Amino acid sequence: MTLQALETIRSCDLIVLPAVSKEECYAYRIVEQVCPEIADMPLLCMPFPMIKDAQKLELAHKRIYDAMEDYLRQGLRVGMLTIGDPGIYSTYMYMHRCAADAGWEARIVSGVPSFCAVAARLGISLGEKDEEIHIIPAAYDVRESLGFHGTRIYMKSGKKLEELLWVLRESMQDKESRVHQDIYGISNCGMENEQVYCGLDELEQAKGYLTTVIVKEHVVQ
């Protein structure tokens, strides 16, 4: 996490956690390592539903925001934790838009995207020269991404990892012999239960919602 994020957390009167409890909140566990005083700060645990029904999702977001706004009306500085960067597939942006639309001052504090942390942990580059970089939410249909060249990053692939690996295996059979793919994966990057995988066979053992898969495609000369 960044120094700005750390200073912002310390300046808040209340911290919102997008989870049932602090023990189940990945973001809280990360922050606690560098900001132990968060254990003594007031917390509001508000789990976000992992659903795709737009109407139900909107109602859930409104309920969560209404709970947060009660504290804003009391004059408190409210912060919300999220893993990675708030601008990349983050639950925070729903609350940010609600607060801004209601006239509150809302600030986005940038963070370290999970796939950048994963690449650093693996010691690899995501893109060089004219290589393309594609970021794909793995919870949705990933088949269209198979035609993308360069580096493909599949985020939060845990729940659909089995399907993703099957699709990748099928695509490797269809690729030209001159096209080579390096496949990596990390579950829970930076945490005490971090696991690193190289190749599809090792990825078969991967578990956890926070699994990032990186596929680097290049042509063998």
Can you describe what each PLM-predicted range is?
Residues 3-104, 203, 210-212, 216-221:
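Class I S-adenosyl-L-methionine
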Residues 22-24, 51, 113-116, 191-193:
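Short gly/pro/ser/thr-enriched loop/turn and capping motifs at secondary-structure boundaries
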Residues 43-45, 106, 135, 183-185:
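Conserved beta-strand scaffold positions in the cores of enzyme catalytic domains, especially
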Residues 56-65, 121-124, 147-151, 196-203:
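Short, surface-exposed amphipathic charged segments that create phosphate/polyanion-binding patches used
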Residues 147-221:
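A contiguous loop/helix-start segment that scaffolds small-molecule binding in enzyme catalytic cores
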